[in-house]
């Protein structure tokens, strides 16, 4: 009987859905209590039902309103005076969606190569900032080069060409970053994505605070709460550096010029500079609690913003001054458009290059307009000529101005309108083009495109290098036999590249440069090379010491007495080496400047003569060797020991200046050298320079030497074997490594590198090993959370951090429909105002200066502990004052203090700040470079398939 009654009760309970009613009563107790009271009053006081109907109508309206709208229905913004408008930038017109073609101007152009997109080639075009901000950024980048490039680069060479390329690359990177920042809506990213990540971070801190009572252990407890969800860069400092390297490599295709990633050495250098020397200290600076406090004060400070003490500086092109080349001598590979057009073979190569780029019609437009101008500028035009010109103009308009044309070139709208008006009008109006500027400006625009975009690209193309080496691709034997070495005359005779084109003329001789080698002034043995292949001897310069009175710098038949000459070496200078062996580098080498005063011709009525001669370090030893060969050794005139290994740079030559000056002065005092032709040539500006350019340590073709060793051993049959082996070992022995400066970034676990990588603030981050087993904590990040927008974030913080009472939480849920959109619109507006204040010129310069000091001023005194504590105290007070008084009355003063203290303590943990910084950095990188999301999806799909 009892089971039957129980079964009937369960069925009745299910039919009446009592569980649902009980759940409704639990969630809405106040509403259910009022509804129950109203129902009881209606039954007991049915005589007053007409009065109670007012309350029943109100309940019915509330239920209908709630059911019709639902919690997801939101009222629009009710503050009509506050409207947030995303930034409308002129940059977007120049680069719509970042896909504006440099030729036709079309969005997502499919005709021309992606490398022709203006953003991909010259992203700094029309990008201007205030001169003070530009100067601050330039100073930071100059310090990057001065601290991480020049210390080792100056030991290699003094040529600035490579550093100039690096400057352009850094400008390209900064310009791309600025342009991509301009394209995103910063307030929307902050409110929709960054704050959501911050909510997750706050939840972890709250959970950790519940487990520890002392603030000192809050950071470690929070790291344990993160568990396996801790960012990979936080495991250790080395993992952080490795992560930044990988991130930099991922960004290279988007932040470097096209084809720059093909140069592995350049990408490695830039990766180490950016990851280890820029990004790592910058993130340390941002995660520093002192920096966080400073930024919080700027954000929550309601006082009027500090006004600039100086007027706004003028706008200047972005980093133009920083990117100006320091190497004054132009590159030997540089060409001008005029030079290309003057040579048929170069013009043919250039047209092939344009054809590959899909832009041959750009050159065709220039040629067509030039021909058109020649015809239209004639004094008197007949009707037939005007008709022909009008037809030609119509072809130009249809071919290069219409949007549907495949050969469209982007012009300013007024140019297109003027050309269209003449092309569609009567033919006699074509003469108006003689005085109109539209066609001339179109021509100037296309000519600028050819000169500034395509000509530099052509100078780095395969077509141009084929032109340079067209004689070296299949060199004949005769070309090698004629001359094996190159002299300065090959370059001196080349006055104009457009006339004789010196590089291509001597290109066929390059292959024979490295055939014979010299070690310490002696020729290496001939190792039995194949007959007919390398059986020639490099042309040498025979020097004969003639004591006859033949003048080097004066008229003939005049006696010469070198003892009466006065010489001095006042300074060391730089000389651009034009020798063919170094034609690729064109390096600037240090030389001694020898001032010569000739006084030996006063007897015949001549005034003293003065001139200067520039001699290299090794030329002195060639002079000493040849003087010893002809005259024997001079015990009182000896050069210091020759430096074989190690840099012979400016500082080294400067230290040897006095010794070399004393050596020359003593040579002049020797009677047997008073009429020496060799010494006179050395001191003469045109006295046989090439005879002193002895190759002391040239390149050795080790491959051919090693191949020839067995044949040489068989031919020698043991004779003179020991000297041969010694010479062979000496020629093949690698030079001793030069002492290097401290590394750019940290690769090896040395004490010096550890000192740079680890610091007292962050130590070793979370100090986790890769194979450490970590506890699988509750994964907050996989939980379903319907928190979206600032209103929901405030409710979440109020519930989790400030522990608002239930009635206030329900009230906020009720007003969510009314005020959510309004609050979020106001928040976007407020953030935009704060960002505008932050990006004011004087504030931006101040932030850049702080960043500069944090990265480069390692030797300066950091902020004292008292200053940091004072800043932290001010931040806490500002946070306390930022909470509205109405909320304080609802939650209480004590709860307010504890909640603010919890948030403040969480921001004073450097490693936790670094965790939040990297999470936010990942979000920002994905917003700035959405292409990375596609790459990640492709990698994920491939991984899942495998």
Swiss-Prot record:
Residues 570-690 form the PX domain. It is found in: Lysosome membrane; Late endosome membrane; Cell projection, Dendrite. It is a multi-pass membrane protein. GO terms for biological process: autophagosome maturation; postsynaptic modulation of chemical synaptic transmission; protein transport. The chain crosses the membrane at residues 24-44, 49-69. Widely expressed both in fetal and adult tissues. Residues 130-304 form the PXA domain. Disulfide bonds: none annotated. Its main location: membrane. Residues 336-468 form the RGS domain. InterPro entries: Phox_assoc, PX_dom, PX_dom_sf, RGS, RGS_sf, RGS_subdomain_2, SNX14_PX, SNX14_RGS. One of its GO terms (molecular function) is phosphatidylinositol binding. The modification Phosphoserine is found at residue 548. Plays a role in maintaining normal neuronal excitability and synaptic transmission. May be involved in several stages of intracellular trafficking. Required for autophagosome clearance, possibly by mediating the fusion of lysosomes with autophagosomes. Binds phosphatidylinositol 3,5-bisphosphate (PtdIns(3,5)P2), a key component of late endosomes/lysosomes. Does not bind phosphatidylinositol 3-phosphate (PtdIns(3P)). GO terms for cellular component: cytosol; dendrite; intracellular membrane-bounded organelle; late endosome; late endosome membrane; lysosomal membrane; lysosome; postsynapse. CDD domains: PX_SNX14, RGS_SNX14. It is linked to Spinocerebellar ataxia, autosomal recessive, 20: A form of spinocerebellar ataxia, a clinically and genetically heterogeneous group of cerebellar disorders due to degeneration of the cerebellum with variable involvement of the brainstem and spinal cord. SCAR20 is characterized by cerebellar atrophy, ataxia, coarsened facial features, severely delayed psychomotor development with poor or absent speech, and intellectual disability. Keywords: Cell projection, Disease variant, Endosome, Intellectual disability, Lysosome, Membrane, Neurodegeneration, Phosphoprotein, Protein transport, Spinocerebellar ataxia, Transmembrane, Transmembrane helix, Transport. It comes from the Eukaryota. It holds the Pfam family Nexin_C. Belongs to the sorting nexin family. This is Sorting nexin-14. Gene3D superfamilies: Phox-like domain, Regulator of G-protein Signalling 4, domain 2.
């Amino acid at each position: 009987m009892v089971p039957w009654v129980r079964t009937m009760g369960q069925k009745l309970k299910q039919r009446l859905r009592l569980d649902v009613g009980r759940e409704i009563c639990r969630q809405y107790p106040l509403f259910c209590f009022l509804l129950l009271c109203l129902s009881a009053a209606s039954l007991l006081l049915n005589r007053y039902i007409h009065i109670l109907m007012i309350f029943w109508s109100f309940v019915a309206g509330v239920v209908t309103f709630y059911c019709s709208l639902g919690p997801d229905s939101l009222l629009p913004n009710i503050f009509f005076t506050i409207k947030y408008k995303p930034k409308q930038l002129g940059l977007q017109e120049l680069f719509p969606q970042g896909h504006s073609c440099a030729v036709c101007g079309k969005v997502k152009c499919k005709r021309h190569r992606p490398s022709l997109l203006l953003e991909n080639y010259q992203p700094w075009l029309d990008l201007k900032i205030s001169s003070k901000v530009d100067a601050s950024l330039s100073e930071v980048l100059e310090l990057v080069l001065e601290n991480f490039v020049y210390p080792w680069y100056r030991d290699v060479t003094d040529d600035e060409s490579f550093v100039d390329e690096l400057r352009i690359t850094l400008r390209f990177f900064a310009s791309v970053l600025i342009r991509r920042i301009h394209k995103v809506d910063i307030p929307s990213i902050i409110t929709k994505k960054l704050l959501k990540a911050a909510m997750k971070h706050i939840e972890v801190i709250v959970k950790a605070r519940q487990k520890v009572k002392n603030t000192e252990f809050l950071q470690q407890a929070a790291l344990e709460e993160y568990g396996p969800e801790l960012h990979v860069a936080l495991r250790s400092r080395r993992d952080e550096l490795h992560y930044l390297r990988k991130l930099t490599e991922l960004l290279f295709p988007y932040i470097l010029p096209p084809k720059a990633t093909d140069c592995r050495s350049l990408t490695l250098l830039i990766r180490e500079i950016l990851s280890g020397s820029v990004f790592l200290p910058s993130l340390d600076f941002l995660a520093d609690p002192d920096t966080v406090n400073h930024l919080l004060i700027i954000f929550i400070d309601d006082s009027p913003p500090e006004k600039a003490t100086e007027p706004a500086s003028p706008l200047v092109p972005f980093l133009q001054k920083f990117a100006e080349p320091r190497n004054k001598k132009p590159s030997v590979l540089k060409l001008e458009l005029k030079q290309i057009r003057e040579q048929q073979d170069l013009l043919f190569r250039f047209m092939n290059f344009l054809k590959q780029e899909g832009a041959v019609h750009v050159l065709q437009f220039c040629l067509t307009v030039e021909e058109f101008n020649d015809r239209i500028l004639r004094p008197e035009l007949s009707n037939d000529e005007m008709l022909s010109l009008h037809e030609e103009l119509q072809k130009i308009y249809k071919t290069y101005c219409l949007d549907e044309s495949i050969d469209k070139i982007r012009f300013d709208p007024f140019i297109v309108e003027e050309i269209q008006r003449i092309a569609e009008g009567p033919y006699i109006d074509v003469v108006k083009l003689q005085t109109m500027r539209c066609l001339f400006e179109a021509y100037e625009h296309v000519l600028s495109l050819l000169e500034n975009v395509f000509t530099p690209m052509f100078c780095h193309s395969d077509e141009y290098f084929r032109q340079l080496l067209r004689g070296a691709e299949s060199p004949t034997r005769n070309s090698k036999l004629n001359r094996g070495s190159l002299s300065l005359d090959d370059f001196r005779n080349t006055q104009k590249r457009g006339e004789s084109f010196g590089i291509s003329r001597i290109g066929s001789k390059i292959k024979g440069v490295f055939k014979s080698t010299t070690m310490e002034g002696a020729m290496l043995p001939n190792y039995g090379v194949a007959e007919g292949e390398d059986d020639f001897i490099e042309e040498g310069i025979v020097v004969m010491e003639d004591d006859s009175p033949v003048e080097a710098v004066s008229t003939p038949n005049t006696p010469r007495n070198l003892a009466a000459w006065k010489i001095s070496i006042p300074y060391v200078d730089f000389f651009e080496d034009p020798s063919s062996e170094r034609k690729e580098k064109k390096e600037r080498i240090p030389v001694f400047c020898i001032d010569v005063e000739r006084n030996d011709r006063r007897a015949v009525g001549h005034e003293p003569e003065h001139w200067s001669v520039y001699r290299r370090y090794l030329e002195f030893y060639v002079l000493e060797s040849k003087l010893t060969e002809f005259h024997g050794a001079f015990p009182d005139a000896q050069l210091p020991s020759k430096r074989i290994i190690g840099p012979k740079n400016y500082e080294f030559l400067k230290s040897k200046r006095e010794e070399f000056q004393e050596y020359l002065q003593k040579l002049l005092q020797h009677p047997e050298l008073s009429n020496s032709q060799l010494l006179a040539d050395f001191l003469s500006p045109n006295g046989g320079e090439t005879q002193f350019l002895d190759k002391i340590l040239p390149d050795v073709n080790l491959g051919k030497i090693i191949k020839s060793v067995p044949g040489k051993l068989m031919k020698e049959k043991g004779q003179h074997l020991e000297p041969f082996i010694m010479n062979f070992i000496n020629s093949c022995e690698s030079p001793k490594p030069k002492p290097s400066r401290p590394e750019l970034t940290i690769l090896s676990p040395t004490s010096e590198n550890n000192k740079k990588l680890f610091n007292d603030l962050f130590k070793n981050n979370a100090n986790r090993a890769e194979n450490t087993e970590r506890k699988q904590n509750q994964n907050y990040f996989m939980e379903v959370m319907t928190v979206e927008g600032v209103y929901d974030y405030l409710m979440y913080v109020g519930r989790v951090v400030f522990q608002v009472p239930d009635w206030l939480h329900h009230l906020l849920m009720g007003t969510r429909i009314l005020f959510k959109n309004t609050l979020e619109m106001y928040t976007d507006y407020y953030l935009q105002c704060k960002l505008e204040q932050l990006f004011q010129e004087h504030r931006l310069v101040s932030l850049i200066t702080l960043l500069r000091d944090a990265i480069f001023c390692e030797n300066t005194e950091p902020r004292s502990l008292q200053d940091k504590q004072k800043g932290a105290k001010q931040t806490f007070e500002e946070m306390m004052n930022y909470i509205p008084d109405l909320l304080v009355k609802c939650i209480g003063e004590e709860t307010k203090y504890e909640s603010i203290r919890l948030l403040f303590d969480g921001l004073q943990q450097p490693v936790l700040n670094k965790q939040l910084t990297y999470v936010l950095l990942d979000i920002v990188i994905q917003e700035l470079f959405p292409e990375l999301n596609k790459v990640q999806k492709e990698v994920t799909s491939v991984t899942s398939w495998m």
